[in-house]
């Protein structure tokens, strides 16, 4: 028996294997809200153009709202034979209001532009949700930054001790990464803000429809100006997947450092018991599973980006069934990102900063060496390369004595070029605040950075 809505030109029914293989309902039913939203906008536009009667529009809207309610309440029966969410909703609508009216909804519309519209609406909504979560995470980082302007810790290059900075300066580096993530999402959202609805299969329609009206109802800035591009475009999905991948690049770096900094070897931070797990055999263990999972999920969202890039590679215009595979990766990446940002924010709110351990760590690795070299250049007019060599010798002498250069009692005994004033440099807080360049680690600079971020999130 032929019962597919598109089966008129076929002489026989589809094989059951094809029905199961071809169906996407188990995945795209996530889009039920967007599908109903798009159909209401389309029907409203058709009525305004005289293609639907007012009573037909009223019946369609009432029926679609009933379908929405049934799905939300778990009463809707999803049948794989319906193939996808679009057909499932339309079939149920026709059952409720009759096929004579229900069958008119798809006038001047193809599933090609319908699915592109639904998908874009979901992607737009996801951008806004992710921006909100990133904003909240930045706010948590700012709270730490305000408290820890004088909490001194070592910075690292090559995971070796580099220079003294404040925890405030450190966490602000991540806050600025997240600020760029928000800007990236905003840019992608702007590029996605064009409606494909009304593009139909690929060439538009002979009906005199008003695409601008349906776009306005759905909250789009404008319409896709080329119908073939309208149904073929998945840049908006790729942009979101890329944006999420970069977010995870940043959060995975933070999580890696939280794992390191919470270890016994560092003990810079303590992760709350509420966000730690134990071992099935080792009673003493306290594992940073939240950070490890976010770090692990990074590979997952990278994979979703590569998957869609590969799906879209070399596809001829316009729509191809390959593009049915575009949604699962998006749904997974969006959920993964939202879940990860929520729990990362909650964990960061409760971390304990171990100030004494951070300060003690500064007494290893000769963090003040660069300050000494800069002093020789600035105060003694010594070329930097020569100053670098002189201070390198100071480091070697300190290591021979088994001490850090911050513990040297008299620099002039190592090299007479150093005077009493140079001894003032062997102080971590002095080093921190001696920086004068924009964006540096000094308290004054950190306060400016906090103001920049606060101004940014206030304007979101």
From Swiss-Prot:
Its EC number is 4.3.2.1. The keyword Amino-acid biosynthesis applies. GO terms for cellular component: cytosol. It is an enzyme of class 4 (lyase). It holds the Pfam family ASL_C2. It catalyses: 2-(N(omega)-L-arginino)succinate = fumarate + L-arginine. It is found in: Cytoplasm. GO terms for molecular function: argininosuccinate lyase activity. PROSITE patterns: FUMARATE_LYASES. One of its GO terms (biological process) is arginine biosynthetic process via ornithine. Pathway: Amino-acid biosynthesis; L-arginine biosynthesis; L-arginine from L-ornithine and carbamoyl phosphate: step 3/3. It comes from the Bacteria. InterPro entries: Arg_succ_lyase_C, Argininosuccinate_lyase, Fumarase/histidase_N, Fumarate_lyase_CS, Fumarate_lyase_fam, Fumarate_lyase_N, L-Aspartase-like. Keywords: Amino-acid biosynthesis, Arginine biosynthesis, Cytoplasm, Lyase. Belongs to the lyase 1 family. Argininosuccinate lyase subfamily. NCBIfam families: argH. This is Argininosuccinate lyase. It comes from Campylobacter jejuni subsp. jejuni serotype O:2 (strain ATCC 700819 / NCTC 11168).
């Amino acid at each position: 028996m032929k019962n597919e809505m598109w089966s008129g030109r076929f002489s026989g029914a589809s094989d059951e294997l094809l029905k199961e293989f071809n169906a996407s309902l188990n995945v795209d039913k996530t889009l039920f809200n967007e599908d109903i939203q798009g159909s209401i906008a389309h029907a409203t536009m058709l009525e305004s153009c005289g293609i639907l009667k007012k009573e037909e529009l009223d019946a369609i809207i009432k029926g679609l709202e009933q379908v929405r309610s049934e799905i939300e309440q778990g009463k809707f029966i999803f049948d794989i034979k319906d193939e996808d969410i679009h057909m499932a909703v339309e079939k149920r609508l026709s059952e409720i209001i009759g096929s004579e009216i229900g069958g008119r909804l798809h006038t001047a519309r193809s599933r090609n532009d319908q699915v592109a519209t639904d998908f874009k609406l979901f992607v737009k909504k996801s951008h806004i949700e992710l921006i909100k979560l990133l904003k909240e995470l930045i706010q948590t980082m700012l709270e730490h930054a305000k408290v820890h302007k004088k909490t001194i810790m070592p910075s690292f290059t090559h995971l070796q001790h580099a220079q003294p900075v404040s925890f405030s300066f450190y966490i602000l580096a991540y806050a600025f990464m997240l600020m760029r993530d928000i800007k990236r999402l905003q840019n992608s959202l702007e590029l996605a803000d064009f409606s494909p609805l009304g593009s139909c299969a690929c060439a538009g329609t002979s009906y005199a429809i008003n695409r601008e009206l349906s776009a306005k109802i759905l909250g789009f800035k404008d319409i896709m100006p080329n119908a073939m591009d309208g149904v073929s475009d998945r840049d908006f999905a790729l942009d979101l997947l890329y944006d999420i991948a970069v977010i995870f690049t940043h959060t995975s770096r933070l999580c890696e450092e939280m794992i390191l900094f919470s270890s016994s070897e560092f003990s810079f931070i303590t992760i709350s018991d509420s966000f730690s797990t134990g071992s099935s055999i080792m009673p003493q263990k306290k594992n940073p599973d939240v950070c490890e999972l976010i770090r692990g999920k990074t590979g997952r969202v990278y994979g979703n980006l590569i998957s869609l890039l590969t799906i879209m590679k070399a596809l001829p215009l316009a729509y191809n069934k390959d593009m049915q595979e575009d949604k699962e990766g998006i749904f997974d990446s969006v959920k993964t990102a939202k879940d990860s940002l929520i729990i990362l924010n909650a964990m960061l709110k409760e971390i304990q900063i171990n100030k004494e351990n951070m300060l003690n760590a500064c007494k290893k690795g000769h963090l003040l060496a660069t300050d000494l070299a800069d002093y020789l250049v600035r105060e003694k007019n010594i070329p930097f390369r020569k100053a670098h060599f002189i201070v390198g010798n100071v480091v070697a002498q300190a290591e021979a004595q088994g001490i850090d250069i911050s513990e040297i009692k008299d620099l002039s005994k190592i090299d007479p070029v150093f005077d009493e004033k140079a001894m003032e440099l062997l102080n971590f807080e002095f080093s921190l605040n001696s920086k004068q360049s924009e964006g540096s680690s000094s308290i004054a600079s950190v306060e400016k950075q906090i103001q920049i971020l606060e101004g940014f999130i206030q304007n979101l």
